[in-house]
Structure formats: C-alpha cells, structure tokens
Amino acid sequence: MAKTIFYFSYRKTEELHAKAKELKKITTDYGYELTDDYQKANVIISIGGDGAFLKSVRETGFRQDCLYAGIALTEQLGQYCDFHINQLDEIIKAAIEDRWLVRRYPTIYGTVNNTKAFYVLNEFNIRSSIIRTLTMDLYINDSHFETFRGDGMVISTPTGSTAYNKSVNGSIVDPLLPSMQVSELASINNNKFRTLGSSFILSPKRKLRIEIASEEGNNEFPMIGMDSEALSIQHVHEVNLEVGDRFINIIKLPKNSFWDKVKRNFL
C-alpha cells in the first residue's frame, strides 16, 4: 500500500520551515505522497521533541490505523523520537528498505466527572491550583483503597513512567506490560491521613476512581494535565482511569529499543 504522509509541527520558525520543506521534498522525491488531511494519512510524522510528538498524537485523534514517527530537532532524541532532523535521507531510506520496525505503546483512558473523556499516551496528573493540599479518596475496582492528602497524583503509562513519574521516585515500566502506575506528589502521612507511600501499578483488569473531597473549595480549580496539555474544569468531583483499549503504533529503527533509550537518557 502506498504511503501517504502527514507532517505535524507547531513551532513556527524559519529554520523549522526550511527543514520541513526539505523533508517534504525528499519524501516526494522517493515517491511518497503528502497530504494536509491527517485522516487520509497512513504515516503521521511530528517534527520537534517529545512534547511535539504527544501533541501530534492528541490532535490527530490517537489513531490506531496509522503509523506515528517523531523527528527531533536536537541531539537528544527522547523517548518518542527515533530520528533526527539532520538524518532526512536515512529516514526515507529506512522506509524504502523496509528497515522500519513498529512498537505498540499502550494508553490510558479516562473521564472527568463522568463526561469529559480522553486518552493519554504519557501521563495524567491532578494537582491543586492554589497553595493548599488536595484530599482524594482512591478506589480500585470500586473498593476503597486509601484517603490521600497532598499536592496531587500522577498516573502514567509505561512510556510515561520515564517522565514526571520517575522524578517522584516511581518505577520505570516496560511498555510490553500494558498498565498504569499511580504515584503520589508530596503526600501527608499522620494519624488522620495514611497512604501507601509508594507507587503502585495496576493491570488492564483494574479500574481506578479518584474522588476529590468537597471541603472549603478543595475541588474548585484543580490543575489537570494530560500529556503536554492542560485541562481546565471547574468543580472536579470524580476522575475514572483505566488502561486504554487503544495502542499507538510508533516507527523505530532497529537496535533502538525502549531500554536502549532509557540507558541513553539516564545512564
């Protein structure tokens, strides 16, 4: 099947425009088609860093019927970008010679107040937007697990486990294990509030419900982050999360596994 490519970028600079123009020319020189409609593309390529890649996946609807690829602008390739902007010929050559490999990354599906539905590829986090703590009750499969009080929580996918989650001492999880990891942000533990005090990992058979306590404006304006986006919802009462039914198919080069990237970025 012929490859139809959609290029995504949100940084509008002269340098990026020139690089994108060069990349599009190389693409068409090798016989690939370009489209301005991402719904008609079977390959979606983001130009930028991991943030640009996450934005491209979100703005193109978390499609499962296409391939995604990330092209980095800096020497640091990141977790989602396997290619560098200065390797344009290598990118296309790898495609021509069928040296592209595809990895399937799991997602998290969630709702806010049982209405606002979303997917995340990296992480979901909820924090207080004012200088005070949040009180939340956590339920696993409708069974009460703990009452949390603190700055907030981050719930990450396996690939997202290397981001915010890692900075709060969460574990790095292999993306071959579809799951979601729940990590605390500065929890308060005393005679009244007691939490697990460590991250925990839930399987696709588990559902997590977070109920935000309604006390003294506690749930007025919490900050909600979904990958690289912020969601503004007044009066958040309940968040439901589970391992998503969608997988994102991402192009990678051989000998550049998830753990190769972890070693390159952290060791």
UniProtKB/Swiss-Prot annotation:
Family in the record: Belongs to the NAD kinase family.
Annotated source species: Listeria monocytogenes serovar 1/2a (strain ATCC BAA-679 / EGD-e)
The gene coding this protein: nadK2
Cofactor: a divalent metal cation
InterPro entries per the UniProt record, alphabetical: ATP-NAD_kinase_N (IPR017438), ATP-NAD_kinase_PpnK-typ_C (IPR017437), NAD/diacylglycerol_kinase_sf (IPR016064), NADK (IPR002504)
Catalytic site positions: D50 (proton acceptor)
NCBIfam families: PRK03501.1
Name this polypeptide is given: NAD kinase 2
Catalytic activity: NAD(+) + ATP = ADP + NADP(+) + H(+)
One of the record's GO cellular component terms: cytoplasm
